[in-house]
Amino acid sequence: MAGHTENEIVIAAPLDLVWDMTNDVENWPRLFSEYASAEILEREGDRVRFRLTMHPDDEGRVWSWVSERVADRASLTVRAHRVETGPFQFMDIQWVYEQTPEGVLMRWI
């Protein structure tokens, strides 16, 4: 069954800081509380392939999967997709960054 989710948030911080922090995959466990670890498997230019591992769920299961991201600083977008199975069947996400008077609008589509 295919699904579609969109989320957004305005972060009251400079665009460069938001871009740098949210694209620093190695530090995602400090930025996103659901991740226990992030291991970089391969990096080439703006493309990074990595393994994310979550903290154990309520039943003690630990989910892990491999994803790939391609960041495009000029267009303020990042394309991400799941390479290896994980807790979901599909994942294809576009991260969109937009400077607003209130801060940086981040959208996940």
Curated annotation (Swiss-Prot):
Assigned protein family: To polyketide cyclases.
Organism whose genome encodes this protein: Streptomyces halstedii
Function: Involved in developmentally regulated synthesis of a compound biosynthetically related to polyketide antibiotics which is essential for spore color in Streptomyces halstedii.
Database matches in InterPro entries: COQ10_START, START-like_dom_sf
Annotated Pfam families: Polyketide_cyc
Protein name (database record): Putative polyketide cyclase
